[in-house]
Amino acid sequence: MMNPLIIKLGGVLLDSEEALERLFTALVNYRKEHQRPLVIVHGGGCLVDDLMKQLNLPVKKKDGLRVTPADQIDIITGALAGTANKTLLAWAKKHGIASVGLFLGDGDSVSVTPLDEELGHVGQAHPGSPKLINTLLENGFMPVISSIGVTDSGDLMNVNADQAATALAATLGADLILLSDVSGILDGKGQRIAEMTSAKAEQLIAQGIITDGMIVKVHAALDAARTLGRPVDIASWRHAEQLPALFNGVSIGTRILA
């Protein structure tokens, strides 16, 4: 089996039918021509924010990571492992892609430990067992995995989806693409930066050009590139016609080098 490709979905993609249609059309086109197995990892930040608003619950973040109190983890699990995951499975079904919905704890695919007491039920992802996912891939299924995990003591944890995808890529020896709303990392003039190193990233953070959630994303991508020992791509789902090329190794966004 060829080494798998993990596509991490983020941003407003889950909220946009147009975006999902573009993405799944690109997946179908890619699968027609390539044998490479695909795995989708997703969060669902926007979906969770909307749900919190409806329930009048405050959304607190610390260093770009969502604070998840004990009384909110069930709601967030429902949104991510439930609604977001099943929405993606429904789109896969509509496009004739055989898929299976999972969370990080299934088959111990990604192991999770608590990240920081102040963040509550927020987990740090670590490589786990490739057995279940490889079994699914060998049988032609596309796993669709939410970024909810579980600790060894049985506590549900909300995990940053970029970090979850990185841990899974390390588990499977897979390549990784982080798909989001932005076409990559932009410089001070709004131009796409084609390649990014650790030194360049720190410089742009110090200059205030990379801020907030993008800092978390860049650090996750740099960690991923270091952990995996190979480049990681950050790109946008908006350029649907370029996605099959991206899935085939052509950089259309920012390529993060270890």
Swiss-Prot record:
What GO biological process, any one, is recorded here?
arginine biosynthetic process via ornithine
Tell me the enzyme class. Answer: transferase
Q: Does the keyword Transmembrane apply?
A: no
Q: Does the keyword GTP-binding apply?
A: no
Q: Name one GO molecular function term.
A: acetylglutamate kinase activity
Q: Self-association or partners: how does it assemble?
A: Homodimer.
Its biological purpose is as follows: Catalyzes the ATP-dependent phosphorylation of N-acetyl-L-glutamate.
- What family is reported? Belongs to the acetylglutamate kinase family. ArgB subfamily.
From the Swiss-Prot or TrEMBL record, give the protein name.
Acetylglutamate kinase
